[in-house]
Amino acid sequence: MSRVAKAPVTIPAGVEVTLNGQELSIKGGKGSLVRSIHAGVEVTKEDNVLKFAPRDGIAGADAQAGTARALVNNMVIGVTQGFERKLQLVGVGYKASIKGNAVALALGFSHPVEHALPAGVTAECPTATEIVLRGVDKQLVGQVAADIRAYRAPEPYKGKGVRYANEQVRTKEAKKK
């Protein structure tokens, strides 16, 4: 059994977990999430603890048990604390603003870029060069951040573009004459 799957997931107070076959739904203060668990993983709920174990005779069940445990743990964290991803816009004239349910970006193109936000993700712009994305689904928040970053990824010479707040951009040296 994988080391990750051996550690149980503790359910904090105020979080409601419902296990219906291989369908797991978690409700908390920030929202609710539903996930189907792989058929090779057996989930048991005892008191305020979820335990994961691989089923015998199914190939890859050990790895799936660890993956399921990590995903469910992220669901519990999401409905209690939520997830946040910060983006920075670096470059002259690069700006961001919120227009309804979309992020409007000026990234040096001949046209403004509008990125529609999916349900479950909210955005705010504390400054014109910062975007803060929040939501309960870690994967969805990260995917939206990656999609916005992909419009203008940091270039390697000056570092201009959209980057994650904690990202270190490796810059190259300019060509010598």
Swiss-Prot record:
Molecular-function GO term, any one: rRNA binding
UniProtKB keywords: Ribonucleoprotein, Ribosomal protein, RNA-binding, rRNA-binding
UniProt protein name: Large ribosomal subunit protein uL6
GO cellular component, one term: cytosolic large ribosomal subunit
GO biological process: cytoplasmic translation
Function of the molecule: This protein binds to the 23S rRNA, and is important in its secondary structure. It is located near the subunit interface in the base of the L7/L12 stalk, and near the tRNA binding site of the peptidyltransferase center.
Keyword ATP-binding: no
Subunit structure: Part of the 50S ribosomal subunit.
Superkingdom to which the source organism belongs: Bacteria
Family recorded in the similarity comment: Belongs to the universal ribosomal protein uL6 family.
Key word Ribosomal protein present: yes
Organism, scientific name: Aeromonas hydrophila subsp. hydrophila (strain ATCC 7966 / DSM 30187 / BCRC 13018 / CCUG 14551 / JCM 1027 / KCTC 2358 / NCIMB 9240 / NCTC 8049)
PROSITE patterns assigned: RIBOSOMAL_L6_1
